[in-house]
Structures are given as C-alpha cells and as structure tokens.
C-alpha cells in the first residue's frame, strides 16, 4: 500500500471519525500526449477512488493532473519512477496495464506506471456491441459517440488504478446480484453491476431490449468490495501499539465479512469466473445469448457502407461468436463444479447443487444441442 499518514495535530480528529487530508496524497501525472478529449475522464477515473479513501478516513487522498512542462517544473521527469504516471501509448495492442512495485520488506508501494494503449477502445467497442447492443442502439454506430468512449476509458483506467493501490483481481465481484437487480436502475445507481471493478466484468448483458437504465449503469464501477478493501488496507485503527491496532482491525473485519458482497476469491470457485455476471449463470447468460440472437436478426446492425465499416463489423461478428462460446462455458462449468464454503463451514468446498445442474442441462439442450440440430436440418 501507499504510505498515507496523518499529521499529529489531526490524529484526534481522525480517531473521532472526521475526514482528514494525508500528509502526502497520491498524485497521478497524465501524459501530455493523451488526446485532450480524454484528459477529464482520466481525472474522473482516478477521483472515483476518493469515496473509498473517505471510508478509510482520508479526504483528497488521491488525484490526477496533467504532467508539468519543463518550464513549470524542471525536476519532473516521466522517467522518474517515483512519480505515479499515466501514459498514453499509440499501439495496436488492445490492452492497458498498472503494475505496482513494492518495497519487499514493508510492502510499501514505491512507484507505479499505468499504460493505456489507444487500441483498447477497439476491444471495448466490440464488448459493448456484443453485451449491450440489444439494449442500446448507440452500440450499432461504426464510431461510438464520445459519451460512450469516455465511460470505456474511465472503466479501463479505474481498474488499473485499483491495481496501483494494491488490489488484486477479485473474480467473485460479479457474482452477487440477481438478474432483477441488474435490471433495476435505482439499485444499479447505488451498487453498480458488481461489487468490484477488480473483477473482469465489462457490461450489463442481463438487460433486455426494453429495459431502461442509465449509461453508467451498463458498466461496472468502484463497488462495495473495493471500498472495503481500501478501508481494510489504509485505515489507521486505534491502539497503543501495532499489535492492538491489528487486533482492532481483525475485529472490525470479522463483522464486515458477514456481508457476502465483500468476499474475495481468485481460487477454484464456479462463481469466480472471468467475464461473467450475476448470481445465476443460467438465467443471466440465457439473456446474453438471446441478446446475441437479437443482434444477428437485425439487418440494420450489419449495414456495410465502406471498408472501415466492413472491418468494424467483421470484428463485431467475431465478438458475437466469442461471447456465445464464453457464456456457454460459464454455464458448463457448473457441471461437476464447486464453490468455496463459508468460513464457518467445516468443508473447504461445496459441490454444485443437483437442482441447479438440471437447469444447466436444460440450457445445454436449448443453446447447444437444439442449436446444432437446427443447423444440421437446414443443411
């Protein structure tokens, strides 16, 4: 974690529960080569972590600003790893990264460098088309509107900032909410589509074409798990020494862990899958596949007008196929699958219930067996 400390004169206020500013906040510097239209949303992505730090008792603990010029600060250098830096890279690679070197003896994060490859937007537009295209006709545009691109950049960067704060992937984050909750705009405004932006969950594919939700509620944001994790890692607990402070942290955490949405899993657990959504894979992924069918049956979606549109639509068609395979695999994983038992359970793992496996078999019949039987009959 970063070294966030409070001033001696603020300690009493902090322990009373008042928000105080850290001695040295975490400041990210933004590459001046970043397209100007994305700078504001990058700053917003970093500041999206502020509520989590407020849970830990800090205000204005994290921020972002444009990197200074030589005239503004002659000591600043993008090659100085002590400055947290967000670089914009011109590359065909569809990715971003956010490694965090630590001092091995203390665990203190001593540097970070986030990289965003410009082509990550190509991947994001494919995901949004396949996952939200049935609900949002904006996804049909060959070039997505700026409002969508801003949300995509924000989601990518917020995830990478989470890594630089010390958070690992939590693939259990997308497994807590029901399909009804994922279609409820008020619920989504409060909780997002998952409890953690550190999961590989992209968009809200539980939505039907007729569902009405805000743009921000079609994507994942900093969630309840993320806020808890930052509080667990950064809050200074009361105590006369380190041992007592750790004891108080443990007692606090034992109470918090009664909330399943704060649980973590990167281990073998059928609920902890990448690119999934919801607490019922059969139900949510059924809707996802129905949405793919909806897109495939609309000729306006596939209107080729020039070479650019041809390349974009080819990529989107491939994304449709990939999502079909992916969502089928999520469901198949429940056959013989197991989930991590609760801490008070004498078992380590619990096998998937037989009743749920019957639902899995019905899904297989509908979306694998009958699908291929129909194709064979057409041939």
In which residue ranges do the predicted regions lie?
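Active-site-adjacent "gating/activation" loops or surface patches in catalytic cores
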Residues: 2-26, 86, 90-95, 99-143
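Conserved catalytic/binding loops enriched for acidic/polar residues
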Residues: 174-374, 379
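The catalytic-center signature of Zn2+-dependent metalloproteases
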Residues: 66-89, 151-208
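Short pre-active-site segment immediately N-terminal to the catalytic Zn-binding motif
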Residues: 140-156
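Short loop/turn segments at secondary-structure transitions that flank enzyme active sites
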Residues: 8, 34, 92-94, 118-122, ...
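Fold-level signature of zinc-dependent metallopeptidase catalytic domains
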Residues: 1-76
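Short, solvent-exposed loop/turn and secondary-structure capping segments
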Residues: 39-42, 52, 98-100, 113-114, ...
């Amino acid at each position: 974690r970063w070294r966030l400390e409070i001033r001696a004169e603020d300690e009493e206020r902090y322990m009373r529960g008042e928000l105080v500013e850290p001695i040295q906040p975490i400041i990210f510097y933004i590459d001046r080569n970043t397209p100007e239209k994305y700078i504001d949303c990058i700053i917003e992505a970093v500041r999206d972590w502020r509520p989590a730090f407020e849970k830990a008792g800090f205000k204005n603990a994290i921020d972002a600003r444009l990197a200074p010029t030589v005239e503004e600060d002659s000591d600043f250098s993008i090659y100085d790893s002590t400055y947290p830096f967000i670089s914009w890279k011109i590359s065909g690679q569809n990715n971003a990264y956010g490694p965090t070197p630590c001092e091995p003896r203390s665990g203190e994060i001593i540097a970070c460098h986030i990289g965003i490859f410009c082509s990550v937007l190509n991947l994001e537009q494919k995901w949004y088309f396949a996952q939200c295209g049935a609900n949002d006709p904006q996804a049909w545009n060959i070039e997505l509107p700026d409002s969508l691109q801003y949300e995509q950049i924000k989601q990518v960067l917020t995830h990478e900032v989470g890594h630089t704060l010390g958070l690992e992937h939590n693939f259990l984050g997308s497994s807590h909410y029901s399909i009804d909750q994922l279609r409820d705009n008020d619920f989504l405004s409060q909780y997002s589509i998952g409890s953690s932006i550190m999961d590989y969950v992209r968009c809200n594919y539980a939505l039907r074409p007729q569902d009405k939700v805000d743009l921000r509620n079609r994507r994942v944001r900093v969630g309840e798990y993320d806020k808890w994790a930052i509080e667990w890692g950064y809050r200074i607990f009361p105590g006369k020494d380190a041992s007592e402070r750790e004891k108080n942290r443990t007692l606090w955490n034992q109470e918090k862990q009664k909330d399943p949405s704060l649980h973590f899993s990167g281990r073998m657990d059928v609920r902890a899958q990448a690119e999934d959504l919801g607490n019922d894979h059969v139900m949510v992924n059924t809707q996802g596949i129905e949405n793919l069918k909806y897109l495939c049956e609309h000729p306006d979606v596939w209107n080729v007008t020039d070479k650019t549109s041809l390349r974009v639509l080819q990529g989107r068609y491939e994304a449709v196929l990939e999502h079909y395979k992916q969502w089928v695999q999520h469901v198949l994983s429940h056959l013989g699958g197991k989930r991590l038992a609760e801490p008070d359970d004498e078992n380590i793992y619990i096998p998937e219930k037989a009743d749920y496996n019957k639902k899995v078999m019905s899904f297989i019949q509908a979306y694998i067996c009958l699908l291929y039987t129909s194709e064979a009959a057409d041939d």
